[in-house]
Curated annotation (Swiss-Prot):
PROSITE patterns: PROKAR_LIPOPROTEIN (PS51257). Disulfide bonds: none annotated. The keyword Signal applies. It comes from Methanococcus maripaludis (strain C5 / ATCC BAA-1333). This is Uncharacterized solute-binding protein MmarC5_1756. CDD domains: PBP2_ModA_WtpA.
């Protein structure tokens, strides 16, 4: 073989090696890319769970780095409707009112749930709020009626905090011995209606399209959408969960146990008020505030959802640190997955 032929053979060999090497590198790169693409775990949760669930997201992703937790916060009713009406999927549904799960999701979209935490309603304010240095647990409804004072709450049609606000104000009439409180604060400033029954119970009617007097009332879809406007002085007082007020370092007054929806001992008092969401044909009875979670039946990765619930149940201190009294062990109802059975008590 002459020198020229030898050079050709050598060059051909080098080219073959490089080509083969490129194929290997490309395949390895593709394989590595496939192996490192994170799984998505989608969560629809109540706005008031933003702080604790942000912590649970960090915990879960630290333990399972191949999982990308993606959270969508909204009013709990809106969260449920994403699944039941808009055909969206999520691995976790976490509601500020656990009863939305049996009432709106079972049996078609869920067959179990766990009750994990509690809360109560308070009235938050800032130093920019009118008469902030005068308002008390005893006189808040009188302060609200003063000229120029504006109060806020979330939409009952989207958010449990919104319909709970209506219940709180209605229950206040009995607690304070003043039968005009709901009339003065709500009926005169919105198109809500209320039925007073012969047995002493009340049914608030929330229309499909809510209208409010914007000179007195500031309303948004969910309660956390109201925090910024409160802090900038767009309105004076906000009906909000105690945990959220604490998380955002807001001043607040507490309400009597007879109306704040935070006391199991007063469950019979709460049951005197209810609300119908007329656009959804859904009636909700006032009851102590309890948060619930489930993995929707149509979740794309059901087992990953169950594993996330397990992480929540194994770390109840996250709720406590966020100012939400935890239910430990959690109370479970329905066909609870075996992986969770040692972490719950059946209700």
């Amino acid at each position: 073989m002459n020198k020229k032929s030898l050079n050709i053979v050598v060059m051909f060999g080098i080219l073959m090696i490089l080509a083969f090497s490129g194929c290997v590198d490309q395949n390895a790169s593709e394989s590595t890319s496939e192996d490192t693409t994170p799984k998505i775990l989608k969560i629809f949760h109540a706005g008031s769970l933003a702080v604790p669930f942000g912590e649970y997201e960090s915990l879960y992703e630290a333990e399972y780095p191949n999982v990308d937790v993606q959270r969508e916060a909204a009013g709990s009713v809106a969260c449920v409707r994403k699944i039941t009406e808009l055909n969206k999927t999520a691995e976790i549904l976490a509601s500020a009112d656990y009863t939305l799960i049996p009432d709106m999701m079972m049996p078609d979209y869920a067959d179990w749930y766990v009750m994990v935490a509690k809360n109560e309603i308070v009235i938050a304010y800032t130093e920019n709020s009118q008469y902030y240095d005068e308002i008390t647990t005893e006189n808040w409804y009188e302060i609200f009626q003063r000229g120029g004072v504006k109060y806020g709450f979330s939409s009952p049609n989207d958010d449990p905090c919104g319909y709970r606000t209506q219940m709180v104000v209605q229950l206040a009439e009995t607690a304070y011995g003043d039968s005009t409180i709901y009339d003065d604060l709500m009926l005169e400033n919105s198109n809500f209606e209320v039925d007073e029954n012969a047995d002493g119970t009340y049914l608030v009617r929330s229309p499909a399209s809510i209208e409010v007097n914007e000179e007195k009332v500031f309303m948004r879809s969910k309660e956390v959408d109201l925090l910024g406007p409160l802090e900038t002085g767009a309105f004076d007082y906000l009906f909000i969960y105690k945990s959220v007020a604490n998380q955002h370092n807001l001043s607040y007054i507490e309400l009597p146990a007879e109306i704040n929806l935070g006391s199991y001992a007063n469950a019979d008092d709460y049951a005197k008020a209810s609300i119908i969401l007329e656009g959804q044909n859904s009636t909700i009875l006032a009851k102590p505030i309890v948060y619930g979670m489930t993995v929707p039946s149509n979740a794309e990765d059901y087992e990953e959802g169950v594993n996330f619930v397990k992480t929540v149940l194994e770390n109840p201190d996250v709720f406590e640190n966020a100012g939400q009294p935890v239910i430990s062990p959690a109370i479970a109802v329905g066909n609870v997955p075996d992986e969770l059975s040692d972490l719950v008590t059946m209700g």
